[in-house]
Amino acid sequence: HIGAVGAKLLYPDNTVQHAGIILGIGGIAQHCFIDNPRDDVGFYGRLSVPFNYSAVTAACLMVSKEKYLEVNGLEEDLQVAFNDVDFNLKLLKQGYYNICLNHVELYHHESKSRGDDTVDTSSAKYRRFVQEHDYIKDKWGYMLYTDRFYNPNLSLKKAFVLDKE
């Protein structure tokens, strides 16, 4: 029943870079617990136990070859952004669960080699990011706002908080 398996990724300063991905936050999806201290237990202990998420980052993702082939692998139209989200959603659609093993920790220098795609809005990187953003939004639509592993009463602006009315 397990699809993709991810790990807790840490920045060099021992804060969390990734411990699962929540759909809908930031428009498409966002890593949760960004900048939390390494030893923080997280919302209801999510950082201290393995936990199901709709997606885990491709920066450290394990999946069996059979399941990878079953869902036709990674989408070639998504060269950089959201290819992991798309892949994880294809696994969910097939009935698999994606899980983040938060006791497995690795250091990750996020985007160190390629930089930030959204800084220079006149760059080819930015244009590609916008195309990939639109592609994933068109393909998955409503699923991006109905994360089955995230409480619908919580905010889509920032993870694990209530919106103020």
Can you say where each PLM-predicted feature lies in the sequence?
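Small-residue-rich loop/turn and linker elements
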Residues: 9, 113-114
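Activation segment
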Residues: 13, 71-72, 110
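Active-site mouth of glycoside hydrolases
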Residues: 109-110, 119
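Conserved donor NDP-sugar-binding/catalytic core segment of glycosyltransferases
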Residues: 1-28, 97
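A short, conserved alpha-helix in the catalytic core of glycosyltransferases
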Residues: 45-72, 77-105
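Histidine-centered active-site/metal-ligand motif
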Residues: 31, 108-109
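C-terminal, non-catalytic tails of nucleotide-sugar-dependent glycosyltransferases
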Residues: 13-14, 25-53, 57, 62, ...
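Short glycine/serine/threonine-enriched helix-capping/active-site loop
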Residues: 5-8, 101-102, 109
